[in-house]
Amino acid sequence: MGWPPAQKPEDSKEEHGGPAQTDVCATQVSEEFPGSCADEVLSSGSISFSGELQSYSHTSESPVETKTPTTSSEEQDEQSELSLLQKDENKLSEMWINHLKSKEIHSERSQPDRRLPPEIPKESAEELDALQSFCTKKVNLIHQRQDLRAKKSNRPKRLQLRWIAETSEVDAFNCTIPDELWNRIYLENTRATLAYIGAITQHISSQCPSCNSKRAELAQSDFLRRRKTLLQSLLLQEKIDEHLHTTDFLTRVGEAHQGFPRLSDDPRIIWKRLTEKMLKGSSGFGRAYSKQV
């Protein structure tokens, strides 16, 4: 099998719906749709190119499988034509992809991205609070209405019960009490008071054991207190007498003369003691003078 000599690659592309037709369709689509749909057009174009290549390869290979090749020169021509067609298709696909990319870039620059989420207004929190308060008020009103309806439905029963109670009280107050009943109640009250008075015993402190025990305790404590004060006074008097008798004038003179030398003592010892006392006295006087100064 061989391709006819008059046939060209461009003609075959036009017959099989090649890239020339897809280029025109793609330019029309890119002019009609915005830049945000460029990805979908690119994917559809690539799918159409792959489908055309597969269909073309199947159509070109099917006759080769059915018919045996005649000469090696025809096979070489077919392979060269196929390689040329593939190169042309690759070039066209690259051109189409670059064209779509440039269109997409221009559309992104000219138009803002529509897929971005809208900016939240500054007063959204206040609006939410207001909406929440409104909803709570409405819910409270609905609950209040339901409560009022329930109360209204329960009112007749309460009114009936009140009316029955009031009528029974009025009947009880308006009824007349017989005199026999009054007399009987009076007699019962007098008997109860007399029995209560008879049950009460008069308290006699001299005969009461608790009072007697308390009186004995008080007398004992008073006796102990008086005895203690008496003993303390006697002890104090004895101490005073001892002090007066032991510290009379003579005893004091004797205590003063205890430090004096005796007549039997050696005069050297006496002078030595006197000098020591004088030195002690002078040293004490000097210290006192230095402190005063």
Curated annotation (Swiss-Prot):
<dbReference type="Pfam" id="PF15379">
    <property type="entry name" value="DUF4606"/>
</dbReference>
<feature type="compositionally biased region" description="Basic and acidic residues">
    <location>
        <begin position="8"/>
        <end position="17"/>
    </location>
</feature>
<feature type="region of interest" description="Disordered">
    <location>
        <begin position="52"/>
        <end position="83"/>
    </location>
</feature>
<protein>
    <recommendedName>
        <fullName>Uncharacterized protein C8orf48 homolog</fullName>
    </recommendedName>
</protein>
<dbReference type="InterPro" id="IPR027932">
    <property type="entry name" value="DUF4606"/>
</dbReference>
<feature type="compositionally biased region" description="Polar residues">
    <location>
        <begin position="52"/>
        <end position="71"/>
    </location>
</feature>
<feature type="region of interest" description="Disordered">
    <location>
        <begin position="1"/>
        <end position="23"/>
    </location>
</feature>
